[in-house]
Every structure is written in C-alpha cells, then in structure tokens.
Amino acid sequence: MADHGPLRPLDERLGRAVAASELPVGPAEFCADLGNTAVALPVLCVVMVWAGWQGWQGWRRRSQEASDGGAPVRWWLPPLAAGLALAAVPALVVPLKLWLARPGPPQMAGGAHDGFYPSGHGATAAVAYGVAALLVLRGRRRMRADRPAAGPVIPTVIAAVALLNAAVGLGLVRRGYHWPLDVVSSWCLAGVLLAVWCAVCDRWSGTGGGRAPGR
C-alpha cells in the first residue's frame, strides 16, 4: 500500500465494484455502523462487567474452599486487558493512517481524503467483538468445572463473531467508506492484539484458559 504495489489497483477495482453493486444500502450502513466505537464499546463493557463478576465469584468460591491459597488469581486481569486492547486500537491505527496516507474511495472525496489504511471501524469491531467472544468463552470454560456446557457454544460464538466482522467489512466497502484491503489490514492488526490478550491472560491471570479453544 505504501509503495503503490500491484495489489493496490486490484483492491481499488474490487472496492469500486462492491460499492456499485446491488447490495442493499440500508443493511450495509447498519453493518458499517457496528464498527463505530459508540456501538462496539458498550457491547464490550457489558461483557467485561459480566466476565469480571464471573471471575470474582469464582475467585471467592475457590478462596473459601482452599486453605493453602495456591497460585495468585488475578480475576480482574482478563476484562481489564480487554479494555486496554480496545484502547490500543486508535493508538495504533491513527499513526498508521498518517504514515501511509492512503487516499479513500471516491465516495469520501468530500471530506478528508487521505488516511484510510487501515480501517479504524474494522479494527474496532474486530477487537471489541473478538475479545468479548474470548471473555465469554473463558467464562464458559470456568463454568464447566461445575456443570457441563450445553450445546456447541464455542463453534457458535466463533462463527457469530466471524460473520459479524465480515458484515462490518462488507458494509464499509459497500458504502464506500474504505477499500477492501483497508478492512483486511485492520483484521490483521486485530489478530495481533487478540493474540497479545491471550498471551497476557495465560501468563499473568493465574487461572489458565486464555488460549483459544483447542490450541
């Protein structure tokens, strides 16, 4: 992107085709808005409160049952790290946009026309909903110690988050807010932040279960 490589014209051609397609404008705008901080942040906050409550209850129950204490359990770390992961999005996206200064699609010519790579909305949605899903899966894993989990929870949550982020990305391109690779790059950035979140929780929370299931 920075050097106007061979992917750029292909990306812009695809973006123009999607923006001019017959995909409904209303649903596309709705999906694009799901990447807005005003939407994604409250969703994450609700999950953070739930995860903190679940972690605190589990810590208190184990403290009452165990006399030796064992390894320290930082039940507050996963939700706190989730909030910090979302806060890191603008801290990383804004400098990248200023540095690369990629022009936006034609539909954005009326406003600021530079600084569209990577997509802030795409990264916000991927991190907020992704880390919210990881918090839910982490909480469900702790609950399984007391009772079996009902149904295919893990595949359902993963599929829902993947579809949600795909819808956000498609909406951003359909409405002409971003080029396709703007969105893909934001997903890559989000993947790094989610991996860091898992590593931090695995290393310092003291409860285990920060890794993605099956890994």
Predicted regions span which residues?
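Hydrophobic alpha-helical transmembrane segments
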Residues: A32-W56, G130
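Transmembrane alpha-helix boundary/anchor motif
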Residues: G5, G26, A87-P95, V131, ...
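Interfacial segments of alpha-helical transmembrane regions
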Residues: V46-P90
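Membrane-embedded catalytic cores of phosphoryl/pyrophosphoryl-handling enzymes
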Residues: M48-V49, A109-R215
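Small-polar-interrupted transmembrane alpha-helices in polytopic inner-membrane proteins
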Residues: L80-R102, P155-L170
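Membrane-interface helix-boundary signature
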Residues: V25-A28, W76-P79, R147-V157
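N-terminal transmembrane-helix/juxtamembrane module of multi-pass inner/ER membrane proteins
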Residues: M1-V43, L98-A109
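Helix-boundary and loop/linker segments of multi-pass membrane transporters
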Residues: A17-E22, D68-W75, Q107, R147-G151
